[in-house]
């Protein structure tokens, strides 16, 4: 006997509410990325930067697999953005996990091409940082969804715990790799060239918006962790071709530095190929 049970469709209010959450999430993520790059350009001490951003939570737990995955993902994302432009990091680190999702990626191909054009020098550290960040955040999302099943803390408190656990993990590394003395010297030598007050505001804004955009991303807990990401992803084949084009261009540029005309011709031949992706 065939069951006559019909699936329950979400109401218009629920759909609009989820859409608002996603819009806020993406907006906060964009603001965070901009401030993050400003801070790294003015004060290139990535370990202090990521430590400060993780300090925007509440300390409630000590050790957790999800916190470790979150820490690795955040560290590698900051490492990648310190080496390459923001668009290249996000193009590389956001690969589509569902083949059928590529049908909705037409608007993302342009992003892929833009990232390749903007990042003219291929940087393996930046690329690998984005790849490791992507993998770590996948595990973080899976562990997080499992941790939210059954009787659990609220999503707001859950992410507060996650942030501070990551802070405990990353602080010893920040002190050993850079340390307070290096931060103080760097602040005097690097930031003194610009407005220190403005740079301080950038650091605060970067830390706050990092916490806000991640906190909002945890609110729609009813959804699978793949669903909020289609607009942030790019087709895997398109990303691979764009990254390959960036690498080829950087090699050509290094070989023809003394011949400006040949460099322009090579760029003209490469750019249409990348844009057509």
UniProtKB/Swiss-Prot annotation:
Record's keyword terms, sorted: Membrane, Sugar transport, Transmembrane, Transmembrane helix, Transport
TM helices/strands, residue ranges: 8-28, 46-66, 124-143, 153-173, 230-250
UniProt xrefs under InterPro entries: Sugar_P_trans_dom (IPR004853), TPT_transporter (IPR050186)
Topology of the protein relative to the lipid bilayer: Multi-pass membrane protein
Family designation: Belongs to the TPT transporter family. GPT (TC 2.A.7.9) subfamily.
PANTHER family named in the record: SOLUTE CARRIER FAMILY 35
Protein name in UniProt: Putative glucose-6-phosphate/phosphate-translocator-like protein 1
Species, as recorded: Arabidopsis thaliana (Mouse-ear cress)
């Amino acid at each position: 006997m065939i069951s006559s049970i019909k699936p329950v469709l979400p109401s218009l209010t629920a759909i609009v509410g989820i859409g608002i959450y996603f819009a806020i999430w993406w907006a906060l993520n964009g603001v965070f990325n901009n401030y993050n790059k400003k801070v790294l350009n003015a004060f290139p001490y990535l370990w202090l930067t990521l430590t400060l951003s993780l300090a925007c939570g509440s300390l409630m737990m000590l050790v957790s697999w999800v916190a470790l995955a979150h820490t690795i993902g955040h560290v590698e994302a900051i490492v990648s953005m310190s080496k390459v432009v923001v668009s290249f990091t996000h193009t590389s680190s956001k690969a589509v996990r569902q083949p059928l999702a590529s049908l909705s990626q037409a608007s993302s191909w342009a992003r892929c091409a833009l990232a390749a054009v903007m990042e003219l020098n291929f940087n393996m550290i930046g690329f690998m940082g984005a790849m490791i960040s992507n993998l770590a955040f996948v595990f973080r999302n899976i562990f997080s969804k499992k941790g939210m099943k059954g009787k659990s803390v609220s999503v707001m408190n859950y992410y507060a715990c996650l942030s501070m656990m990551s802070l405990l993990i990353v602080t010893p590394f920040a002190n050993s790799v850079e340390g307070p003395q290096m931060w103080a010297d760097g602040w005097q030598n690097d930031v003194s060239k610009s407005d220190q007050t403005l740079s301080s505001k950038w650091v605060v804004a970067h830390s706050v918006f990092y916490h806000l955009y991640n906190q909002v991303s945890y609110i729609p807990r009813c959804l699978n962790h793949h669903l909020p990401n289609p607009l942030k992803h790019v087709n895997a084949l398109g990303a691979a071709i764009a990254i390959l084009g960036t690498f080829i261009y950087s090699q050509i540029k290094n070989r023809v530095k003394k011949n400006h005309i040949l460099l322009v011709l090579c760029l003209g031949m490469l750019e249409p190929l990348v844009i057509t992706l």
